[in-house]
UniProtKB/Swiss-Prot annotation:
Residues 189-321 form the Fe2OG dioxygenase domain. Belongs to the iron/ascorbate-dependent oxidoreductase family. GA2OX subfamily. GO terms for biological process: gibberellin catabolic process; gibberellin metabolic process; response to light stimulus. GO terms for molecular function: gibberellin 2-beta-dioxygenase activity; gibberellin 3-beta-dioxygenase activity; metal ion binding. The lineage of its organism: Eukaryota, Viridiplantae, Streptophyta, Embryophyta, Tracheophyta. 2-oxoglutarate binds at residues 199, 312, 314. It comes from Oryza sativa subsp. japonica. This is Gibberellin 2-beta-dioxygenase 1. Pfam families: 2OG-FeII_Oxy, DIOX_N. Keywords: Dioxygenase, Iron, Metal-binding, Oxidoreductase. Its EC number is 1.14.11.13. Plants overexpressing GA2OX1 exhibit extremely dwarf phenotype and are unable to achieve phase transition from vegetative to reproductive growth.
Length: 382
């Protein structure tokens, strides 16, 4: 994906206004100032791109990726958007054939198994051809093979881009094996996922008709003054969380809603509204990548606020390791001044922990090593 060039361009940045930080369940308090979100042009000189990717992932764990070769107008993206939009436009009973999400399949409002809800409906698919083909029979009964082909084509494009970004990250960090991260995600048993989220219009603060129906056409309006969970004039589309995997690649239409929790110029963390850009792909560092780099990279907390008068459609590819993969900080990230921060664990163990907790829980904190933990020194040798 990276095309060498003769010159090294200046790093691009997008300055966005800060959204009000969450103060309490009943609402928000105002914030101010501007926050800079890095933009990385993948078509630039490779060495410069590698440094920019590493810097952005260490600073915020998030960046806007352009020049990646998969714009919204590209056939691979346009076909997926059309296919998934057609699915979400179906009658509730038809969509329910692909659900309920457990966790894969079609879901409405419920996120996970512990009571988290959001103003959305979604498809969650395992990113391998056999799994997609199996699920496609319930998503597109008329032509499942066509749906499978569209989804798998998109997955391959995202897998290629994720590997390129991870390899650049390995180079930027100066790892002995720059491809270490990408090899985890391309293993035959890798647990990669594709998620498509559909957020209905919320200009009057709507709520989805739940009861396992998710009837988008019969949205019930509620007054803003009655909404205890309203934030910044909207409702929680997808609650605050970090992604547990290695890396996430998000592409969305031109409807805003994504917010990231990042420090401002004074170091104070606040929620920042990310400007929409259908031509860009937004890259998130996940919990596993934070653990692999011994906390050097940041797994960013983010959320979606449903405030728009038009539907928001977003597609996220999650690059993940195999279930049996042991996650342990790489030796080059452990030093006398930066001892091992997390105990080693398997991806299966981490997923089990994740499914036992609420969405907003800081899962990685449960795997931290105490300062006086005797395993700290011994594990540092691994």
């Amino acid at each position: 994906m990276v095309v060498p060039s003769a010159t090294t361009p200046a790093r691009q940045e997008t300055v966005v206004a800060a959204a009000p930080p969450a103060a309490a369940a009943s609402g928000v308090v105002g914030g101010g100032g501007g926050v800079t979100i890095a933009t990385v042009d993948m078509s630039a000189e490779r060495g410069a791109v590698a440094r920019q990717v590493a810097t952005a992932c260490a600073a915020h764990g998030f960046f806007r990726c352009v020049g990646h070769g998969v714009p919204a107008a590209a056939p691979v993206a346009a076909r997926l958007d059309a296919a998934t939009a057609a699915f979400f436009a179906m009658a509730p009973a038809e969509k329910q054939r692909a659900g309920p999400a457990s966790p894969l399949g079609y879901g409405c409002r419920s996120i996970g198994f512990n009571g988290d809800v959001g103003e959305l409906e979604y498809l969650l698919l395992h990113a391998n051809p056999a799994a997609v083909a199996h699920r496609a029979r319930t998503i597109d009964a008329m032509d499942p093979s066509r749906f499978s082909a569209i989804v798998n084509e998109y997955i391959e494009a995202m897998k290629k881009l994720a590997c390129e970004i991870l390899d650049l990250l390995g180079e930027g960090l100066g790892l002995k094996d720059p491809r270490y991260f990408s090899k985890l995600t391309t293993n035959a048993d890798s647990d990669c996922l594709l998620r498509i989220n559909h957020y209905p219009p919320s200009c009057n603060i709507h709520k989805l008709d739940h009861d396992d129906q998710c009837n988008i056409k019969s949205l019930v309006s509620t007054k803003a003054s009655n909404g205890g969970n309203l934030m910044a004039g909207g409702r929680i589309g997808f609650g605050e969380h970090s992604d547990p995997q290695i890396l996430s690649l998000l592409r969305a239409n031109d409807v805003e809603g994504l917010q990231v929790f990042v420090p401002d110029h004074e170091g104070k963390e606040m929620w920042v509204q990310v400007p929409s850009d259908p031509s860009a792909i937004f890259v998130n560092v996940g919990d596993v990548l934070q653990a692999l780099t011994n906390g050097r990279l940041i797994s960013i907390r983010h959320r979606v606020i449903a405030t728009a008068c038009r539907p928001r459609l977003s597609t996220i590819y999650f690059a993940s390791p195999p279930l049996h993969a042991r996650i342990s900080a790489l030796p080059e990230t452990i030093t006398a001044s930066s001892p091992r921060r997390y105990r080693s664990f398997t991806w299966a163990e981490y997923k089990t922990t994740m499914y036992s907790l609420r969405l907003s829980h800081s899962r990685l904190e449960l795997f931290k090593i105490d300062d006086d933990d005797s395993d700290n020194a011994s594990e540092g040798k691994a």
